[in-house]
């Protein structure tokens, strides 16, 4: 019966922790398609940053990825001039023959940077290279291909993939830390409320028995018989 109650409580605790995880994830992280801007509660837009639970190195690397994606798709002036115009990649696609290859090389630099800083898994890199291939096929169309490549915004899509991956991984890491802290607190609380050791009770009982034995009166043996001489000279058996 105690095993059934224990398993039931563990199941309820696991469901509760999963609900808490989902609630924490919904409040602190949401996937995005726009890696450049986010909107505050008051409706104002500002530059998108990684969530607060990410490390400083992750945040610094994200700024570099963000600036490179902006340079490729949105602005010729680079990160110092955040004006939504046109980036280098669509212009390179206008060059005959070599243009699409140069555009592919530009977009691939973003993947190399992200992989070097975040150690991306294989499935994420395959997805990002797939976006570059689509952009390359679109840019093969003369003139209009450059327009389609600009609208497709390959580096923007790949930067959003990087943001979502890094944010989700950091969220799982933060949640694991919270779970570990909770388990440690439960261990300490259980140790403080643990029942006395059974062996100690045995020793106490043993001491009580010993005290009873010490309180008993000592057992005295009867005196040994001895032979004494009577007054008439005959030996007489008796006790001294």
From Swiss-Prot:
Any one of the GO CC terms: cell periphery
Primary localization: membrane
Membrane topology (Extracellular): 107-131
Subcellular location: Membrane
Matching PANTHER family: MEMBRANE PROTEINS (PTHR35519), YALI0C06193P (PTHR35519:SF1)
Protein name listed in UniProt: Uncharacterized membrane protein YLR326W
Miscellaneous comment in the UniProt entry for this protein: Present with 1520 molecules/cell in log phase SD medium.
Low complexity biased stretches: 197-210
Residue ranges, Cytoplasmic side: 1-85, 153-240
Transmembrane segment boundaries: 86-106, 132-152
Highest taxon in the source lineage: Eukaryota
Record region (Disordered): 181-240
Membrane protein topology class: Multi-pass membrane protein
Keyword Signal tagged: no
Induction notes from the record: During S phase of the cell cycle.
UniProt keyword list: Membrane, Transmembrane, Transmembrane helix
Record's keyword annotation contains Transmembrane helix: yes
